[in-house]
Amino acid sequence: MAGRVEGKVAFITGAARGQGRSHAVRLAQEGADIIAIDVCKRISSNEDIPAPTPDDLAETADLVKNLNRRIVTAEVDVRDYDALKAAVDSGVEQLGKLDIIVANAGIGNGGQTLDHTSEADWTDMIDVNLSGVWKSVKAAVPHILQGGRGGSIILTSSVGGLKAYPH
């Protein structure tokens, strides 16, 4: 029995681990090939979780390959539109098309309240969590439109968008 996305290609940001890895593995289980990117380094000094690494991204690739699906990976910062576009273009060239965008990359501020968040940390969060999503979709959506088959765009967010942090 074919999976729900059999033969499709998905572009996933923040794919080295966590939700991004989970999306890559699940979509591969359902039959998709994957274009996976991650910055693979710390962006903000105030983040409270360890930074993703190139080894993390390689592990995601191995998990997808073990499902007999193809995967193209790149270390890319979603704040860098030109690098995003180059990674998506390369992935589409290798895999033939694009059907799904999962803009998942994001950072936190270590749980700091607004009055303790530095301007630099705020700028990093906006540049990754908002502008990075727009840049990711902008870099990828022309391939979906060019395919003429329709497609899906999935944008993830923080639980902070649903429930305020205490303090």
Walk through the language-model features, giving the residues of each:
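Substrate-binding pocket helix/loop in short-chain dehydrogenase/reductase
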Residues: 112-114, 121-126
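The beta1-alpha1 cofactor-binding region of Rossmann-like NAD(H)/NADP(H)-dependent oxidoreductases
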Residues: 54-55, 75-87, 119
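A short, exposed helix-loop element centered on a Lys and neighboring polar residues
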Residues: 137-138
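Residue(s) in the substrate-gating loop at a strand-loop-helix junction
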Residues: 158
